[in-house]
Amino acid sequence: MDSSGALEGSSPLPPRGVNPANFIIPPVEGIAGGGTGYGWADVGTESSNLCKGVNVIDPTQIPSAELLHVWCMPSTANVGQQEMPRPFDHVSLLAARNERESVQIALRPKLSWASSGLAGTVQIQCTDLCSASGDRLVFGQSLTMRHVVPILGVPDALVPLDLPIAQINLLPGETTSIWVSVDVPAGQPPGHYEGQILITALKANAEMSAQVLSKAEKYNLYRELKSCLEMVEPVGGKPLEEVAERLKSATSSLKRLLLWPVFQEFYKDNGSCDMMDEDAFTNISINMKFNVTVWDFTLPLTPSLPAVFGISETVIEDRFALEHGSEGWYDALDRHFKWLLQYRISPYFCRWGDSMRILAYTCPWPADHPRSEEYYSDPRLAAYAVPYAPILSCSNEARDSLRKDVEILKSKPHWRKAYFYLWDEPLNLDQYELIRSMSSDIRTYAPDARILTTYYCGPSDAHGSSTFEAFVKVPKYLRPHTQIFCTSEWVLGNREDLVNDITAELQPENGEEWWTYVCMGPSDPQPNWHLGMRGTQHRAVMWRVWKEGGTGFLYWGANCYEKSLVASAEIKFRRGLPPGDGVLFYPGEVFSPSHEPIASIRLERILSGMQDIEYLKLYSSRYSREEGLALLEKTGAYLSPERYTLEHTPIDLMRAEIYRTCGA
């Protein structure tokens, strides 16, 4: 599963403080290619035609709908650059509390209103979503927008846009997609929330650029507005005199803000605000209604299915030039850990040794460190990996470290989430013996410890090793030194009936579990997370897990791209692996100065699949698991590994039926 390649390179970045509308996202190379194959052109947005006296369309004088197509697409759609326009429609979503639901807004120019290789620049604004009772889903907090950027020509990277007003460049003859997500807080009141998205074609000249605030100015404006909010927000129960004083102070601050130069053009000589420009701006914009129904179901904070995903510590060390164990190293791991928790997955960091032995750990600090409990007790973790320190060294110090960690953790309520991952895909009896030996060490300190072992075949030097029967009999080689038997979905192929053969060999009464994983396989048309697969194919990985009855899931790597020693270097997938295999997010530095990772569309679809499991679990708890399976098939969402929906509608039907029967 793991290998390290080598690559050096870099991608052009905008200088700090430059408006993102003035540059185009650079190409990100995969196995090969790049350059103009990704629509890259090293140009800005200034129009040279204006200087030459050539007639240029003024987008402020005509409706934006005459300049560009706008339509919405579901989150399972792969909206490529050659995606053709669909009819305009409004957005209507259904979401539970503590759920993220996403949709795409596609933009394609009808003609060009700029020059220098661009079709034009578009501004996107979104209002808060409000309910009739006055509750809000706040734009910039619960609502976010990201630009879908192609990787190897396939839409995948989700690059955050500047908020509250985003600007993007459109290229002639190409479709661009914006990924809009709604994160519903766990405490959000149920109801129908309404808002709108305004999409407006802009002038691409120096005058427009001058109206954009610098980052420092934006921060000052943000600070002033936040101060006003803090003055008036906590007025409940306050004496009337204090409320009046707070309002007076806030009014004074707001009047001061309106005197900023950036607002001067909206004022007449008498100081009253001239709304004509605003009305004209709104009238030429494309107005897309954005509605979300929040229903009275809250996704559990702790995922029902433990889904453990690996993060290579060596990739982080190489790309960000971090010394193992340094302050920067701990900061980087901490940042990755916290960021990945939002996707309902339980991360573990890993370092690979010879013959596929692995050091896997969720917390980079020892169990007696003050920070460790913050990791292990996080309710968003469904499972955590405990490091087996002797895998790196058989020294007394390593054994003492293991003993100390286990003795501390086994006394905690969260110990039931703990597991040890020692070896990836053992291939022969010698490797099986090493697993048994390491497990014995661990069980000396904690007889109830759980050992996880992944495998796709029986030991090669055992009798009949090449047969499915040898694969099924693996538990007899590893019992009682493995409790979580994690098998490859590739072995099953399209034979769901083989699940019964696997589970029949297990002893759940003795704490044995069956988990699954995907890696290089299975391949198309079965569900996996390779780049270029259909969106429903990505989402169906978790449908398959739920239908087959696995109690957990493992994915070998989320950041295992080729080695580089430069943070902003272009991304290349590892040779020998299907594109996208082992890569679910990208370094933020590739796209901007930000250090925050960039999610892939595939990672968002993993989240959607994890959320679907919670919906199906709710339905099954009301009507039985058999009825849950019947719903999955009746709606046409998922029938088998090669028979699942290619369209999004059955997903909406399934979710709507669960909403209707369990919460409406």
Go through each PLM region and give its residues.
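An acidic-aromatic substrate-binding cleft motif
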Residues: 277-390, 410-413
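Contiguous beta-strand segments within globular domains
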Residues: 88-111
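Substrate-binding cleft of secreted/luminal carbohydrate-active enzymes
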Residues: 533-579
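Catalytic domains of carbohydrate-active enzymes that cleave complex glycans
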Residues: 374, 387-394, 398-431, 435, ...
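Surface-exposed binding patches on compact interaction domains or structured appendages
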Residues: 17-88, 110-179
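Active-site clefts of carbohydrate-active enzymes
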Residues: 509-535
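Short, surface-exposed loop/turn segments at beta-strand-coil junctions that are enriched for proline
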Residues: 183-190
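A short beta-strand micro-motif common to beta-rich folds, especially ectodomain repeats
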Residues: 191-202
